[in-house]
């Protein structure tokens, strides 16, 4: 039995050693800008990131991240790391987003680039490998982007994944596996999964409509037909409008001046509309004709859809109308369990944030009440002063009147 335990330990050790962390960024260093490069692409008004835990948090140090700090700005900053390929291994991309400003319109996603990226010139048209994360703009756009580059073209997921739109921290996780399957998680809970070939248009369709097939001329796809024996009733045809029988010519109507008087028209209660014969089940009905399909000669399978041959840069390339988003807990790895363990901390983070925010909201509520009361008291004082002034004026008028009488 001893050898069995040894094998298990060795296997566990090998599994541990094989796990790779390509990038881990918790922004726990005041010198974070030494490793992150701002873009200087011309023609863009870029904003700056600032290191902060925000105005409400669970842990003032652990919850520090980089926050967008200027409204109506582009943001473009990236960090390079040792390049890698995810061939035959899972790829896990994870990070946290906190829209503390109650965002109205702005991106919260990351992009992964290969090593050819010029970080100082990164911009919206820079080619990337993967784009992943939340995007919000008004009530109509609240989605999680999952976009892959394939043969020089960006392909969007065909499914709609809704993102979180509150003010608290949320972890977003993308897992891509060598069997061409994927998962998207928010706060460690799976919100979408499937097959890369099924949910993206990387490849031509497997089947296409047979271009040589046509519907037979004698194919009857009418479920019902008019009853040939049904006849229109003789009294069916009635005018849609008739003269109002209750209308009378006005007394001041002058036929010579106004022309011949005609009563106004009203809807005819006996009007039945256009007559249609009754419908019968069609005895020759064959159902809806389905265009036959054939194998698409342009379809070429690819069992490497998951593969990213080179990744070595992660960047934030965003536009935000209202700033205040905090990014943190960036992790790129092939270890699914490690990512899950890191994301599990979100519950504690959210609990602490909510507790602090509720306390702040209560303080603000009391402050607003006090200010409202002060404003109300001042209005009452002003009204009293006005009443006193009116009394004084009335008294003066009375004194003047009495004086005049004397």
Curated annotation (Swiss-Prot):
<feature type="region of interest" description="4 X approximate repeats">
    <location>
        <begin position="191"/>
        <end position="255"/>
    </location>
</feature>
<keyword id="KW-0256">Endoplasmic reticulum</keyword>
<keyword id="KW-0106">Calcium</keyword>
<dbReference type="InterPro" id="IPR001580">
    <property type="entry name" value="Calret/calnex"/>
</dbReference>
<feature type="repeat" description="2-2">
    <location>
        <begin position="273"/>
        <end position="283"/>
    </location>
</feature>
<dbReference type="InterPro" id="IPR009033">
    <property type="entry name" value="Calreticulin/calnexin_P_dom_sf"/>
</dbReference>
<dbReference type="GO" id="GO:0051082">
    <property type="term" value="F:unfolded protein binding"/>
</dbReference>
<feature type="compositionally biased region" description="Acidic residues">
    <location>
        <begin position="378"/>
        <end position="391"/>
    </location>
</feature>
<feature type="binding site">
    <location>
        <position position="135"/>
    </location>
    <ligand>
        <name>an alpha-D-glucoside</name>
    </ligand>
</feature>
<keyword id="KW-0479">Metal-binding</keyword>
<dbReference type="GO" id="GO:0005789">
    <property type="term" value="C:endoplasmic reticulum membrane"/>
</dbReference>
<keyword id="KW-0430">Lectin</keyword>
<feature type="repeat" description="1-1">
    <location>
        <begin position="191"/>
        <end position="202"/>
    </location>
</feature>
<keyword id="KW-0143">Chaperone</keyword>
<feature type="binding site">
    <location>
        <position position="109"/>
    </location>
    <ligand>
        <name>an alpha-D-glucoside</name>
    </ligand>
</feature>
<dbReference type="GO" id="GO:0006457">
    <property type="term" value="P:protein folding"/>
</dbReference>
<feature type="repeat" description="1-3">
    <location>
        <begin position="227"/>
        <end position="238"/>
    </location>
</feature>
<feature type="disulfide bond">
    <location>
        <begin position="105"/>
        <end position="137"/>
    </location>
</feature>
<dbReference type="GO" id="GO:0005739">
    <property type="term" value="C:mitochondrion"/>
</dbReference>
<dbReference type="GO" id="GO:0005509">
    <property type="term" value="F:calcium ion binding"/>
</dbReference>
<feature type="repeat" description="2-1">
    <location>
        <begin position="259"/>
        <end position="269"/>
    </location>
</feature>
<feature type="region of interest" description="3 X approximate repeats">
    <location>
        <begin position="259"/>
        <end position="297"/>
    </location>
</feature>
<comment type="function">
    <text>Molecular calcium-binding chaperone promoting folding, oligomeric assembly and quality control in the ER via the calreticulin/calnexin cycle. This lectin may interact transiently with almost all of the monoglucosylated glycoproteins that are synthesized in the ER.</text>
</comment>
<feature type="binding site">
    <location>
        <position position="111"/>
    </location>
    <ligand>
        <name>an alpha-D-glucoside</name>
    </ligand>
</feature>
<feature type="repeat" description="1-2">
    <location>
        <begin position="210"/>
        <end position="221"/>
    </location>
</feature>
<feature type="binding site">
    <location>
        <position position="128"/>
    </location>
    <ligand>
        <name>an alpha-D-glucoside</name>
    </ligand>
</feature>
<dbReference type="InterPro" id="IPR018124">
    <property type="entry name" value="Calret/calnex_CS"/>
</dbReference>
<feature type="region of interest" description="Disordered">
    <location>
        <begin position="207"/>
        <end position="259"/>
    </location>
</feature>
<dbReference type="InterPro" id="IPR013320">
    <property type="entry name" value="ConA-like_dom_sf"/>
</dbReference>
<dbReference type="GO" id="GO:0012505">
    <property type="term" value="C:endomembrane system"/>
</dbReference>
<feature type="repeat" description="1-4">
    <location>
        <begin position="244"/>
        <end position="255"/>
    </location>
</feature>
<keyword id="KW-0862">Zinc</keyword>
<dbReference type="GO" id="GO:0030431">
    <property type="term" value="P:sleep"/>
</dbReference>
<feature type="compositionally biased region" description="Basic and acidic residues">
    <location>
        <begin position="207"/>
        <end position="251"/>
    </location>
</feature>
<dbReference type="GO" id="GO:0042048">
    <property type="term" value="P:olfactory behavior"/>
</dbReference>
<keyword id="KW-0677">Repeat</keyword>
<protein>
    <recommendedName>
        <fullName>Calreticulin</fullName>
    </recommendedName>
</protein>
<dbReference type="GO" id="GO:0045169">
    <property type="term" value="C:fusome"/>
</dbReference>
<dbReference type="GO" id="GO:0005615">
    <property type="term" value="C:extracellular space"/>
</dbReference>
<dbReference type="GO" id="GO:0036503">
    <property type="term" value="P:ERAD pathway"/>
</dbReference>
<dbReference type="InterPro" id="IPR009169">
    <property type="entry name" value="Calreticulin"/>
</dbReference>
<feature type="binding site">
    <location>
        <position position="317"/>
    </location>
    <ligand>
        <name>an alpha-D-glucoside</name>
    </ligand>
</feature>
């Amino acid at each position: 039995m001893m050898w069995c335990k040894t094998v298990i330990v060795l296997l566990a050790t090998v599994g541990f050693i094989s796990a790779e962390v390509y990038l881990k960024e918790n922004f726990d260093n005041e010198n974070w800008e030494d490793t992150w490069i701002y873009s200087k692409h011309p023609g863009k008004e870029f904003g700056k990131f600032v290191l902060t835990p925000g105005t409400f948090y669970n842990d003032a140090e652990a919850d520090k991240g980089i926050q967008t700090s200027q409204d109506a700005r582009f943001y473009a900053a990236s960090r390079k790391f040792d390049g890698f390929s995810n061939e035959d291994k899972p790829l896990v991309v994870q990070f946290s987003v906190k829209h503390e400003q109650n965002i109205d319109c702005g991106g919260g996603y990351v992009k992964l680039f290969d090593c050819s990226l010029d970080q100082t010139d990164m911009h919206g048209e820079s080619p990337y490998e993967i784009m992943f994360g939340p995007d919000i703009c008004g009530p109509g756009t609240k989605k999680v982007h999952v976009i892959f580059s394939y043969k020089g073209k960006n392909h969007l997921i065909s499914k709609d994944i809704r993102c979180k739109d509150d003010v608290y921290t949320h972890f977003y996780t993308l897992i891509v596996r060598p069997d061409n399957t994927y998962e998207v998680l928010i706060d460690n809970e799976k919100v979408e999964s499937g097959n890369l070939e099924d949910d993206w248009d990387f490849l031509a369709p497997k089947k296409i409509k047979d271009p040589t097939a046509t519907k037979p001329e004698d194919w009857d796809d009418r479920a019902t037909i008019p009853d040939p024996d049904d006849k229109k009733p003789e009294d069916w045809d009635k005018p849609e409008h008739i003269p109002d029988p209750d209308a009378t010519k006005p007394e001041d109507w002058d036929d010579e001046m106004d022309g011949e008087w005609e009563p106004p028209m009203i809807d005819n209660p006996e009007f039945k509309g256009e007559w249609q014969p009754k419908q019968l089940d069609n005895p020759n009905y064959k159902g809806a004709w389905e265009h036959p399909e054939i194998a698409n000669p342009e379809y070429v399978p690819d069992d490497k859809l998951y593969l990213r041959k080179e990744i070595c840069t992660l960047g934030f390339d965003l536009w935000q109308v209202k700033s205040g988003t905090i990014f943190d807990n960036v992790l790129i790895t092939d270890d699914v369990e490690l990512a899950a363990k890191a994301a599990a901390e979100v519950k504690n983070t959210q609990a602490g944030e909510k507790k602090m925010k509720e306390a702040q909201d209560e303080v603000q509520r009391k402050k607003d009440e006090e200010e409202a009361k002060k404003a109300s008291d001042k209005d009452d004082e002003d009204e009293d002063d006005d009443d006193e002034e009116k009394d004084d004026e009335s008294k003066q008028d009375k004194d003047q009147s009495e004086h005049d009488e004397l």
